[in-house]
Amino acid sequence: MPNFIEGNLKADGKKFAIIVARFNSFISDKLLDGALDSLVRSGATDSDIDVVRVPGAYEIPLIAKKLAASLKYDAVICLGAVIRGATPHFDVVVNEVSKGSAQVSLETGVPVLFGVLTTETIEQAIERSGTKAGNKGSDVAIAAIEMANLVDALQ
């Protein structure tokens, strides 16, 4: 029988940073609420969580790198909403934010979780921030807890 290694869903004793884009705040604030709720329900306290606001999603990777490189956090959670418009701006922002966030995780060894909604419409973003499709902020926070514990288990 193989040995299975996986992270648990206990947040107590872990430190989390949450980066939240202010652009489309009517969505990202709901994602933040979901993330905070999941972290606290899993055992994190307010003093275990730092929330950093940035102007928009494009600014997330730089701040993620600073937070992860500080080694003060067991995981960094990135939240925001990029909604497609009439120009190619959407593709540029989404590509850079997703690649940048992943690169930070690989460079630092700190889990950086991508909770930036990338939707075609405002309705899709609303659905994913607490209505029909659940709250992706909550989902990403749960994944952050699991990844923080998995990284610890592998050390």
Curated annotation (Swiss-Prot):
Q: Provide the leader sequence positions.
A: none
Q: What does this protein do?
A: Catalyzes the formation of 6,7-dimethyl-8-ribityllumazine by condensation of 5-amino-6-(D-ribitylamino)uracil with 3,4-dihydroxy-2-butanone 4-phosphate. This is the penultimate step in the biosynthesis of riboflavin.
Q: Which GO terms describe its molecular function?
A: 6,7-dimethyl-8-ribityllumazine synthase activity
- Spell out the GO cellular component terms annotated for this protein, sorted alphabetically and separated by semicolons: cytosol; riboflavin synthase complex
Q: Which reaction does it catalyse?
A: (2S)-2-hydroxy-3-oxobutyl phosphate + 5-amino-6-(D-ribitylamino)uracil = 6,7-dimethyl-8-(1-D-ribityl)lumazine + phosphate + 2 H2O + H(+)
Catalytic residues, chain numbering: H89
Name the Pfam families on file: DMRL_synthase
Name of the protein in its database record: 6,7-dimethyl-8-ribityllumazine synthase
Similarity field: Belongs to the DMRL synthase family.
Gene encoding it? ribH
What enzyme category does the UniProt record give? transferase
Q: List the disulfide bonds.
A: none
| Pathway info | Cofactor biosynthesis; riboflavin biosynthesis; riboflavin from 2-hydroxy-3-oxobutyl phosphate and 5-amino-6-(D-ribitylamino)uracil: step 1/2
- Keywords of this entry: Riboflavin biosynthesis, Transferase
Specify the species. Desulfotalea psychrophila (strain LSv54 / DSM 12343)
**Is ATP-binding a UniProt keyword of this protein?**
no
The residues that hold (2S)-2-hydroxy-3-oxobutyl phosphate are A86, T87, R128
Supply the EC number(s).
2.5.1.78
